[in-house]
Amino acid sequence: MPTIENEPKLDFKDVLLRPKRSTLKSRADVDLVREFVFRNSKKKYVGIPIVASNMDTVGTFEVAESLSKKRLFTTIHKHYSVDQWMEFVNRISSNQDILSQIGISSGISDYDFTKLKKICGLIPELQYICLDVANGYSEVFVDFIRRVREEFPRHTIFAGNVVTGEMTEELILSGADVVKVGIGSGSVCTTRKKAGVGYPQLSAVLECADASHGLNGHVMSDGGCTNPGDVAKALGAGADFVMIGGLFAGHDQCGGDTVEKDGQKYKLFYGMSSDTAMEKHEGSVAEYRASEGKTITVPYRGDISKTVQDLLGGLRSACTYTGAKKLKELSKRATFVRVTQQTNEQYATFEISPSELQNLNIAV
């Protein structure tokens, strides 16, 4: 019979990190680099564990080139052809280190598996695979993880998405190294409206991280971050990686058409289960499906490097406030307080961007 879980589940908006005594003298003293050895692949990762989402408007080769300069990771979207992959590898031939900070994404069809084998065979330096479905609870998905693990025993596998501890354990035991956590939390996802299914992201990360770490596995919080503070909360809750879509949208390096409205530039950004994505990549929305994503216009934001600086600065600040000398220590130092209000919004409607400020005529 139907049941109700009465324990409250929390999202990033429901909490703040409590400040704690700190010996740090400057944000510059914080070490954001993490090192992991993965459970199944046995491979070592070194970098800053912020990951660009494998959406076709975010997980682009151009984004990967920019983020790798700061040791951030990119999961390349699955719609690039084999030829496009080879063109990219040839273009970065003088800087092959980029390949250590990117992963190839794949669906779970036989076609996807064949394409994955071909690309990984042509590019042996590519060591990360992201297996991505909206619903990570299906037996078909678990079987596909086992199939990929058998074919690629030394590759590191990201797999998801799920939101509960028992399924996190299932995916890890089936061959995944990093489980992606999040259903319905993305900025352009409408699964919670269309299907009524989901889980508040902070609680999902807390529970899945606990399950994963008990097996020496790892988790990646995917979705729900609206600002750098949310990224810090996800890491404080136990996420080893944080995947970002909306915060990285709208930049020069991103996909999505550029449009103009009222003299202002915007870029299209859409969910990968939206009408826009399905019509672009599959020709139409299948008659048995409903769109579970939306299409929006994001104000044009220029080069992605400024957003990266803002994210990393926010993380360093979170660490100094909580007394974490290294990002590794943040989850050990984190105490969350439940709140009814995040920020003072008195002048929110009057806020202007740096570019708007430059265009103002200052009265003398």
Swiss-Prot record:
K(+) binds at G184, G186, C189, R192. GO terms for biological process: purine nucleobase metabolic process; purine nucleotide metabolic process. It catalyses: IMP + NH4(+) + NADP(+) = GMP + NADPH + 2 H(+). Keywords: Metal-binding, NADP, Oxidoreductase, Potassium, Purine metabolism. The active site is at C189 (thioimidate intermediate), T191 (proton donor/acceptor). One of its GO terms (molecular function) is GMP reductase activity. GO terms for cellular component: GMP reductase complex. It holds the Pfam family IMPDH. Gene3D superfamilies: Aldolase class I (3.20.20.70). Its EC number is 1.7.1.7. GMP binds at D222, G223, G224, G245, G246, G271, M272, S273, R289, A290, S291, E292, G293. The keyword Acyltransferase does not apply. NADP(+) binds at residues 26-27, 78, 132-134, 183-184, 272, 288-289, 317-320. Catalyzes the irreversible NADPH-dependent deamination of GMP to IMP. It functions in the conversion of nucleobase, nucleoside and nucleotide derivatives of G to A nucleotides, and in maintaining the intracellular balance of A and G nucleotides. Homotetramer. PANTHER family: GMP REDUCTASE (PTHR43170:SF5). Belongs to the IMPDH/GMPR family. GuaC type 1 subfamily. This is GMP reductase. The gene is gmr-1.
